[in-house]
């Protein structure tokens, strides 16, 4: 959970968030599978991919001039990769006023906790500034042509190094952050669709 006030009420921040998540969700899902090579089997029920939904809402917001509150209302399902139902005030520091990221696999590894938290917080902070919309549009068009958005099977079976590097450069300014992200995303370039199949260890023991 991350405080909703971190996102704030600026419309461009929310539009950037929808656009970036929609375009790089396949990268994010593989990363947040943590020490496992695939997302947990019940993710399709309890952390449903949002790529297509976010893209539709993004375009609707542009065409119809939706406000941030109207955007949030359209995202009101709990069992998605991100749960916005607890968002009640975009300026409040209330303990329960949170955005819940549900896509990560459960883990007892504190390094993976930190990596996941670092990704989500840096993603939100990046959305507060200008992004390369033309690049993101181009990448999203390529994904659609290949049937990738919302396809959890392809999220698990595909490693896209070029897209992952692009995402790293978009989100992180620190090279060490990029290294930690790529280690957890690439997982020694191994792929498995079997649930709970562990990747080769990529974190130090704490």
Regions found by a protein language model. Give the residues of each.
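C-terminal accessory/tail domains of diverse enzymes
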Residues: 7-206
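Histidine-centered catalytic micro-motifs
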Residues: 1-5
């Amino acid at each position: 959970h991350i405080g909703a006030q971190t996102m704030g009420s600026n419309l461009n921040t929310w539009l950037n968030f929808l656009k970036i998540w929609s375009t790089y969700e396949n990268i994010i899902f593989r990363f947040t599978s943590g020490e496992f090579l695939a997302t947990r089997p019940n993710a399709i029920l309890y952390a449903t991919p949002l790529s297509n939904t976010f893209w539709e809402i993004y375009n609707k917001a542009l065409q119809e001039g939706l406000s941030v509150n109207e955007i949030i209302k359209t995202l009101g399902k709990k069992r998605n990769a991100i749960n916005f139902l607890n968002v009640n005030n975009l300026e409040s520091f209330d303990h329960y006023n949170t955005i819940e990221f549900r896509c990560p696999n459960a883990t007892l590894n504190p390094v993976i906790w930190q990596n996941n938290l670092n990704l989500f917080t840096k993603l939100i902070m990046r959305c507060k500034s200008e992004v390369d919309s033309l690049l993101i549009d181009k990448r999203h068009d390529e994904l659609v042509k290949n049937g990738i958005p919302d396809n959890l099977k392809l999220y698990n079976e595909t490693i896209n190094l070029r897209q992952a590097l692009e995402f790293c450069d978009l989100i992180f300014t620190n090279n060490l952050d990029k290294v930690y992200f790529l280690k957890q995303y690439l997982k020694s370039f191994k792929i498995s669709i079997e649930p709970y199949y562990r990747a080769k260890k990529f974190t130090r023991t704490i």
